[in-house]
Amino acid sequence: MDIIFYHPTFDTQWWIEALRKAIPQARVRAWKSGDNDPADYALVWHPPVEMLAGRDLKAVFALGAGVDSILSKLKAHPEMLKPSVPLFRLEDTGMGEQMQEYAVSQVLHWFRRFDDYRIQQNSSHWQPLPEYHREDFTIGILGAGVLGSKVAQSLQTWRFPLRCWSRTRKSWSGVQSFAGREELSAFLSQCRVLINLLPNTPETVGIINQQLIEKLPDGAYLLNLARGVHVVEDDLLAALDSGKVKGAMLDVFNREPLPPESPLWLHPRVAITPHVAAITRPAEAVEYISRTIAQLEKGERVCGQVDRARGY
């Protein structure tokens, strides 16, 4: 069994050694331009077209939760990957736990009005504020996949009203489910906090725009943990300036790194992190990949395969 590996920023040597230890029967090598030797599996992130084109691969593993970069390249270069080759993504590998930490900490930050107290502190103003009530602090999760379910589970502990929206209806205990475009308005109407965990597909690009924001309650909050292209930043800024949206916590942006001239940096109602909400944990990723390859070799059904038509 031959495995090729490519990631522009990861510690390649660590990954090669870890994979060799986890899959001792495999010959693992770092792919370099000009390497056309046979391979059974490819582990990649933002791979060059030539790495995958023309290969008879058993599977490709994207080294992250998103596969939009690979799918966008496939549209421009359909010869890059044969339709018969299954594409897998890292569904969790520690990312679910990180998303839980991020979402819970930020929801509690808003619920306890720490954002308001920070603004008061900036002007040396001492003023206790009325508390929010849980029953009026409904949290809506856009995107009900593996990470969305993890976030919902963690927020249930805090007894907030929860709802989710996705392409198909879910049956999560304690979570009100909405499905399809025809139910999006009803879903949004009660969301005091909107958490975005949608996949990046042509249908979801720009989905958080003026029209969507207008359907939220006045003074809602936005937490974007998915992709920057989901948000029309000018529409969000206008909503923040008007008070329609009271606050936004943004981990992802249309352009990354976020340009220094972006007005998001200095907006008093915006908090920013540099795309760190959930990062790939190498040891857990290697364990998942080695387990999945073993299942594929045995002809077993496995989780995490991407539906190329849907984009996730």
UniProtKB/Swiss-Prot annotation:
Q: Which residues are annotated as active site?
A: 227, 275
Protein's name according to its UniProt entry: Glyoxylate/hydroxypyruvate reductase A
The question of whether NAD is a record keyword is answered with yes
InterPro entries named among the record's database cross-references: D-isomer_DH_CS (IPR029753), D-isomer_DH_NAD-bd (IPR006140), GhrA_Enterobacterales (IPR023514), NAD(P)-bd_dom_sf (IPR036291)
EC number(s) given by UniProt: 1.1.1.79, 1.1.1.81
- What UniProt keywords apply to this chain's record, in alphabetical order? Cytoplasm, NAD, NADP, Oxidoreductase
Name where it mostly resides: cytoplasm
Q: Which PROSITE patterns does the UniProt record give?
A: D_2_HYDROXYACID_DH_3
Q: Which family does it belong to?
A: Belongs to the D-isomer specific 2-hydroxyacid dehydrogenase family. GhrA subfamily.
Gene name, per UniProt, is ghrA
Catalytic reaction equation(s): glycolate + NADP(+) = glyoxylate + NADPH + H(+); (R)-glycerate + NAD(+) = 3-hydroxypyruvate + NADH + H(+); (R)-glycerate + NADP(+) = 3-hydroxypyruvate + NADPH + H(+)
UniProt xrefs under Gene3D superfamilies: NAD(P)-binding Rossmann-like Domain
Q: What is the lineage of its organism?
A: Bacteria, Pseudomonadati, Pseudomonadota, Gammaproteobacteria, Enterobacterales
